[in-house]
Amino acid sequence: MARFNAAFTRIKIMFSRIRGLISCQSNTQTIAPTLSPPSSGHVSFAGIDYPLLPLNHQTPLVFQWFERNPDRFGQNEIPIINTQKNPYLNNIINAAIIEKERIIGIFVDGDFSKGQRKALGKLEQNYRNIKVIYNSDLNYSMYDKKLTTIYLENITKLEAQSASERDEVLLNGVKKSLEDVLKNNPEETLISSHNKDKGHLWFDFYRNLFLLKGSDAFLEAGKPGCHHLQPGGGCIYLDADMLLTDKLGTLYLPDGIAIHVSRKDNHVSLENGIIAVNRSEHPALIKGLEIMHSKPYGDPYNDWLSKGLRHYFDGSHIQDYDAFCDFIEFKHENIIMNTSSLTASSWR
């Protein structure tokens, strides 16, 4: 505990430096959090009114740490990066201290040693609202699909097209992928294929699966102290470089969903550093999963998240991308966004 406190004291000094740096960045835009229902109670986009749905002060916060190289940590150490440049563990602890009334989830995966698992358990004991959820404790079979089925469906669809409109390169590529899967692992699925490369696709894919479960993930994992969470509830995912400075309060989001938007040099883009949903199996995320089930090489960020959101809210794409980013953006004055951009991300 003394070790945690000493580290936390050091990091508070760094937090003040980061705040000073961010205050000098003219492209950082935030607004005051919505702590009471807006007078209109809805927002319009692409000619449709969407209700502003609440995420109350007990909606769990979720951080994620998937570690592909646990050996870089001590055998009895918490396997989450915690350096002066990248104080990710301290950011999580900081959130648990500020948001004492909320459950703070840490969604983890990796070939951890017995001592590292024990250290994660000790973290839960020291901060009673922190709940460590192991990826292996959750069942995702209801969201899975065999790769052979995905490939065969795409081959049938492509071959049904006229020769002039058919993408022959894609067709041949899918046929080759089907041949490889049938030869090497006919039972391979969308989920098992994302366990091969322990990189950002692995990280992004399982984040989306967790968000489909929402607060049900805590109940499924049997975490104590979560009895107050309602089945079918949502959660707020934060990258570990997102720094809380105060409580988030109750949030009101269009149809109960919002994500982080990066704004740099007059360019905006949807980012998965923050994803908030007010319910499990949000239809926008289900739409993205349908895209993953229908594409031969779906990407969990570009297809599942970005395209899934756009198809759900603006299927005909009558609104431009910037307008959609403005509509779906998660904003809050009590979060310093993407602090690793001030140093360098150490997740690799």
Curated annotation (Swiss-Prot):
Top EC category: transferase
Under the cellular component aspect of Gene Ontology, which terms does the record hold? extracellular region; host cell Golgi apparatus
The residues annotated as the active site are 271
State the deletion phenotype. Answer: Reduced virulence.
Cytoplasm in keyword set: no
Question: EC number(s)?
Answer: 2.4.1.-
**Source organism superkingdom:** Bacteria
Q: Which cofactors?
A: Mn(2+)
UniProt keyword terms in alphabetical order: Glycosyltransferase, Host Golgi apparatus, Manganese, Metal-binding, Secreted, Toxin, Transferase, Virulence
> Where along the sequence does the record place the motif called DXD motif?
239-241
Which residues does the record give as Mn(2+) binding sites? 241, 338, 340
Q: What molecular functions are annotated in GO for this chain?
A: manganese ion binding; protein-arginine N-acetylglucosaminyltransferase activity; toxin activity
Binding-site positions, UDP-N-acetyl-alpha-D-glucosamine: 64-66, 88, 237-240, 338, 340, 345-348
**Annotated family:** Belongs to the glycosyltransferase NleB family.
Q: What is known of its domains?
A: Adopts a GT-A fold and acts as an inverting enzyme that converts the alpha-configuration in the UDP-N-acetyl-alpha-D-glucosamine donor to the beta configuration in the N-linked (GlcNAc) arginine product.
Task: Write down what this protein is called.
Answer: Protein-arginine N-acetylglucosaminyltransferase SseK2
